[in-house]
């Protein structure tokens, strides 16, 4: 077992009850282009076209053969583009349940499949896009092979669902998915889970189980990779979400593309935080209708630490998100708030009275409690960074744009979510995730 000591479990109110309910009917779904790092689409459909679930919507020009398929059948109601014609979202108005059939196999045949067969099946169905590389967090190049594949069967994000509750409903499909993944690598398939949890073991010795304990980010895949298979420019691993492993298992044994998604709808502004069964790319406004408290709320696809805020073109459940978080917009001003004791304010540096109430849960809002200022190294970053990385030095070099030093300090091991806690505790109010992405892009382009 690997025990994480540094980190932070955010004491936020509104944790979900770990019970699964059917969500409301979803009439609009979308595939979000900006979730795929470096992707340039070659469109195969246009507005007004009728599509079936599993039908290809566009192909990646930079990664020929990588298809992005429809998560539902219906009509293409909108193709939204941003600056420089960057694809933001392809919106589908759901109609019917027609789907593209795929070849399927008996469970005992999965171990005999070649890697070419597995890759072809994943590419044509669109499930190849569920895989991501580390470093760079990109969709893998077809034909490549990773040193290892990681599945995080635990989640320490604030307000997250318990993955074991979800996996237990589809344990057979999950194990079939693991079998398929072993055909894609000569190394290990790492399943990382919380310490003390009873996990059904796969019979294939290529699948290994690793226990992690401790505060967030103990459940992040970046933490698991750092301790088990550290990456570099010459060593690449892949990772995939546990619900996508279930979808892979169903694809190969049933011949159908599963786009079901169980998400945690939670946060201080949710009336009854719970787990909802919905579909990939679901409209967040439809998913949360009638379930939120009155007021000016911010709906977030993903975690409050690293998710994507609701907007007109991005108001849909993200491809890699397992939760929908709702907090209050912090628009109000507080007179002399900086001199008040702050019983209802959380602080990691003991500057408010709320720090001394260890079991208190706080109704966090979007208020930053101050504006941007100089980066102040007072030890906050080291408190929440469990990786063997000099956090302050790395963040300083990221802000300075020093790619050589940032690479030497370990930035290739990181993704935006790995620096989310550093952003949260930063006295200077810096957003380190976008800065890291710019540096990673520059490193990749420079080779």
UniProtKB/Swiss-Prot annotation:
Keyword Transport annotated: yes
Keyword line: Ion transport, NAD, Sodium, Sodium transport, Translocase, Transport, Ubiquinone
Name of one Pfam family that matches: NQRA_2nd
Translocase listed as a keyword: yes
One GO MF term attached to the UniProt entry: oxidoreductase activity, acting on NAD(P)H, quinone or similar compound as acceptor
InterPro entries to which the protein is assigned, alphabetical: NqrA, NQRA_2nd, NqrA_C_domain, NQRA_N
Catalyzed reaction equations: a ubiquinone + n Na(+)(in) + NADH + H(+) = a ubiquinol + n Na(+)(out) + NAD(+)
EC number: 7.2.1.1
BP GO terms, sorted: sodium ion transport
Group of enzyme by EC: translocase
Subunit composition and interactions: Composed of six subunits; NqrA, NqrB, NqrC, NqrD, NqrE and NqrF.
Similarity field: Belongs to the NqrA family.
Known function: NQR complex catalyzes the reduction of ubiquinone-1 to ubiquinol by two successive reactions, coupled with the transport of Na(+) ions from the cytoplasm to the periplasm. NqrA to NqrE are probably involved in the second step, the conversion of ubisemiquinone to ubiquinol.
Protein name as it appears in the record: Na(+)-translocating NADH-quinone reductase subunit A
Native species: Yersinia pestis
Gene this protein is translated from: nqrA
């Amino acid at each position: 077992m690997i025990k994480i000591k540094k980190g932070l479990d955010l004491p936020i109110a509104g944790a979900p009850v770990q019970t699964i309910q059917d969500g409301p009917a979803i009439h609009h779904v979308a595939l979000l282009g900006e979730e795929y790092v470096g992707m340039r689409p070659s469109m195969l459909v246009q507005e007004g076209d009728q599509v079936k679930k599993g039908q290809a919507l566009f192909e990646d020009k930079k990664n020929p053969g990588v298809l992005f398929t429809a998560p539902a059948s219906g009509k293409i109601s909108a193709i939204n583009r941003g600056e420089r014609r960057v694809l933001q979202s392809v919106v589908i108005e759901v109609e019917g349940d027609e789907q593209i059939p795929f070849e399927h196999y008996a469970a005992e045949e999965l171990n005999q499949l070649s890697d070419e067969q597995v890759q072809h099946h994943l590419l044509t169905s669109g499930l190849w896009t569920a895989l991501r590389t580390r470093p760079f967090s990109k969709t893998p190049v077809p034909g490549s092979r990773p040193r290892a594949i990681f599945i995080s069967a635990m989640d320490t994000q604030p307000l997250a669902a318990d993955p074991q509750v979800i996996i237990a409903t589809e344990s057979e499909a999950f194990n079939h998915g693991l079998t398929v993944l072993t055909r894609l690598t000569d190394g290990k398939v790492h399943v990382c889970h919380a310490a003390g949890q009873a996990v059904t073991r796969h019979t294939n010795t290529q699948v290994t189980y690793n226990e992690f304990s401790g505060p967030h980010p103990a459940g992040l895949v970046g933490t698991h990779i750092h301790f088990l298979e550290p990456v570099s420019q010459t060593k690449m691993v892949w990772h995939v979400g546990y619900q996508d492993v279930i979808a892979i298992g169903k694809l190969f044994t049933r011949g159908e593309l599963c786009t079901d998604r169980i998400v945690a709808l939670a946060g201080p502004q949710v009336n009854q935080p719970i787990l909802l069964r919905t579909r990939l790319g679901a409209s967040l406004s439809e998913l949360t209708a009638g379930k939120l408290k009155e007021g000016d709320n911010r709906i977030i696809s993903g975690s409050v630490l690293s998710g994507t805020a609701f907007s007109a073109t991005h108001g849909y459940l993200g491809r890699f998100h397992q939760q929908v978080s709702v907090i209050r917009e912090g628009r109000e001003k507080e007179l002399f708030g900086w001199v008040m004791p702050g019983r209802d304010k959380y602080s990691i540096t003991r500057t408010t009275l709320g720090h001394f109430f260890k079991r208190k849960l706080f109704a966090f809002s979007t208020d930053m409690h101050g504006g941007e200022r100089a980066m102040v190294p007072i030890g906050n970053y080291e408190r929440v960074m469990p990786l063997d990385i000099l956090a302050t030095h790395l963040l300083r070099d990221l802000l300075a744009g020093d790619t050589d030093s940032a690479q030497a300090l370990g930035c290739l091991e990181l993704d935006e979510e790995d620096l989310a806690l550093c952003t949260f505790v930063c006295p200077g109010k810096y957003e380190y995730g976008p800065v890291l992405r710019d540096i990673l892009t520059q490193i990749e382009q420079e080779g």
